[in-house]
Amino acid sequence: MNMISLKDDLRGNSYPGRGIIIGRTPDGTKAVAAYFIMGRSENSRNRVFVEDGEGIRTQAFDPARLTDPSLIIYAPVRVLGNKTIVTNGDQTDTIYEGMDKQMTFEQSLRSREFEPDSPNYTPRISGIMHVKGCTDCDVQEKGHYNYAMSILKSSNGNPDSCCRYTFAYENPAAGEGHFIHTYMHDGNPLPSFEGEPKRVETMDDIDAFTSLLWENLNEDNRVSLFVRYITIATGAYETRIVNKNQ
């Protein structure tokens, strides 16, 4: 699979919806995660990301303007031990609870389907990062890192069928990541993402990567962005959050 330009891909798509990027920095030392949300309606745009423990949650920027909290208020990021979960809905909690009971990522999602927002039937996209630092391994090692991504979507808009796809990446290559988003592009109804997660570039500098993403998301539709870099050897992390509403 050819690597695509994140800048060009984002700039050329006014509405990819919600998106997850997971990968590894070019120097190989850090795991990379990013999650963004976009909105077309006032209800969807009336949101911000806020920190919540080691993760984040969405909340209404102006509570008085919140008309329907379902599907838009949730925890996109939660941390379970050395696992970081990133999703576009409350399946974050489903994965967290399942893996806490020794279920796999894929098994945990078996109880979930795409969102019930007819006629779009928005896909549920999810990612899991497993960063095993040197506190868990031989002192000579620099830690282990792998990740997986999932999409649950309707069968070409048919709500009677759910298509389940999981993509696993072991010992991911330095300098690249994978990008999955809910919609192919704007439309009515919105067309679900198709194919494998896109192979994209990463950057060593978290601020530069955050700027690359935010500046190339459609200015009218972008709402919030979360970026996290995790040092693979130690598990230490740093986070950036950008909200359009301030």
Describe the residue ranges of each PLM region.
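Conserved short alpha-helical segments that host acidic/polar catalytic motifs at enzyme active sites
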Residues: 1-246
